[in-house]
UniProtKB/Swiss-Prot annotation:
The gene is fabV. The record marks E75 as: Plays an important role in discriminating NADH against NADPH. It comes from Coxiella burnetii (strain RSA 493 / Nine Mile phase I). Involved in the final reduction of the elongation cycle of fatty acid synthesis (FAS II). Catalyzes the reduction of a carbon-carbon double bond in an enoyl moiety that is covalently linked to an acyl carrier protein (ACP). Pathway: Lipid metabolism; fatty acid biosynthesis. The keyword Lipid metabolism applies. HAMAP family: FabV_reductase. This is Enoyl-[acyl-carrier-protein] reductase [NADH]. The active site is at Y236. Gene3D superfamilies: NAD(P)-binding Rossmann-like Domain. Transmembrane segments: none annotated. Its EC number is 1.3.1.9.
Length: 406
């Protein structure tokens, strides 16, 4: 069938299989063109492996270091006239290309927060790898979590803490810049967001992997966070998500102590740059900030996407054969170019004057839109979007059954 983008609010409800495959192919080509990673990881588990930083780290591990990879995610196969989710198509393309290159690549589709999926993953690691996982990437972005032990349901929210936040935001599709006010979160919303987006599940994963002897001596585990400039702090760093990320950082310190003493391992937080993702598109203020950031970083020739960021994380931080450079809080900073003084000063200056009339020229909102559509496989060169495509795509390692998530 012919697949066109259908955008509702912050998400696109369709995905293009060939476009997603082309996008994954571009990332793979980038990883292959860079000099290969020496001393890189060999057996990598990526939790949240189908889009964004998780997918990019899977590609860098596989095609940059020749690593075997297992990816865990929660995606939807095609059903009737409904396309699969982009992460499904991304993984189908990744696995197909990895297998053709002689690389081990298997995936598990289901709720990463559940004990059942953790056990399935452990069983696969024991059966196929006999343990020995030397890198665990934790890259989950989810709006809700069911606690595996208590059954309690938590929903995350994106709100300020303490007082109403007033600023401006942009409707990315129309280019309309307007004032926005966001009411503060309740105590329950703060706690719930921490339960979903904090470090609780990361710790459950690492403890389970350790208990069943799945981790190698010297293992590294990395989770991602974002800090950003003062401009976004009220809604992000000092808001509910920021509170959850502080919990994630606290978890990293605890896991680091455990892994260091048991396996000479490390648990690390990587602070990444602001990028267009399905998650960031839903945050008020942030799309307008990213549109300005893209413009300035592209002009200075320091713009990076997910794949460039993950390449730099692996090459210059995790596997540089030197001590991993961190900030005073022990975090890896690959948001260093975004947070450069000259970049931030320019954004601050433009922020005051940006409005509906000048947003298309002052910012790179066109680049934001382009990246947004690319997430769903649209707007890629060399794809004929007027031609019908087969929307059912198989992921080689996954058997689709009616019980699989819809």
């Amino acid at each position: 069938m012919i697949v066109q983008p259908k955008v509702r609010g912050f998400i696109c409800t369709t995905a293009h299989p060939e476009g997603c495959a082309r996008h994954v192919g571009e990332w793979i080509n980038y990883a292959k063109q860079e000099p290969s990673l020496t001393g890189g990881p060999q057996k990598v588990l990526i939790i949240g492996a189908s889009t964004g930083f998780g997918l990019a780290s899977r590609i860098v591990a596989a095609f940059g270091a020749g690593a075997k990879t297992i990816g865990v995610f929660f995606e939807r196969p095609a059903s009737g006239k409904r396309t699969a989710s982009p992460g499904w198509y991304n993984t189908a393309a990744f696995e197909k290309t990895a297998l053709a290159a002689g690389l081990y690549a298997k995936s598990i589709n289901g709720d990463a927060f559940s004990d059942e999926i953790k056990q399935q993953t452990i069983d696969l690691i024991q059966k196929d790898w006999q343990g020995g996982v030397d890198l665990v990437i934790y890259s989950i972005a989810s709006p809700r979590r069911v606690h595996p032990r208590t059954g309690e349901i938590f929903n995350s929210v994106l709100k300020p803490i303490g007082q109403t936040y007033h600023n401006k935001t942009v409707d990315v599709m129309t280019g309309e810049v307007s004032p926005v006010s966001i009411e503060p979160a309740t105590e329950k919303e703060i706690r719930d967001t921490e339960a979903v987006m904090g470090g609780d599940d990361w710790a459950l994963w690492i403890n389970a992997l350790f208990k069943y002897n799945c981790l190698a001596e010297g293992v590294k585990t990395v989770a991602f966070t974002y800090i950003g400039p003062e401009l976004t702090h009220a809604v992000y760093r000092n808001g509910t998500i920021g509170r959850a990320k502080l919990h994630l950082e606290k978890t990293a310190r605890e896991l680091d102590t455990q892994l260091e003493s048991a396996l000479s391992g490390q648990a690390l937080i990587s602070v990444n740059k602001a990028l267009v993702t399905q998650a960031s598109a839903a945050i008020p203020v942030v799309p307008l900030y990213i549109s300005l950031l893209y413009k300035i970083m592209k002009e200075k020739n320091i713009h990076e996407g997910c794949i460039e960021q993950m390449w730099r994380l692996f090459k210059e931080r995790l596997y540089s054969n030197q001590n991993i450079p961190t900030d005073s809080e022990g975090r890896i900073r690959i948001d260093d170019w975004e947070m450069r003084e000259d970049v931030q000063a320019e954004i601050k200056r433009l922020w005051e004057s940006i409005n509906t009339g000048n947003v298309e020229t002052v910012s790179d909102i066109a680049g934001y839109r382009e990246d947004f559509y690319k997430l769903f496989g649209f707007g890629l060169n060399g794809i004929d979007y007027e031609r019908g495509v087969e929307i059912e795509k198989a992921i080689p390692s996954i058997t689709v059954t009616p019980e699989n998530p819809e």
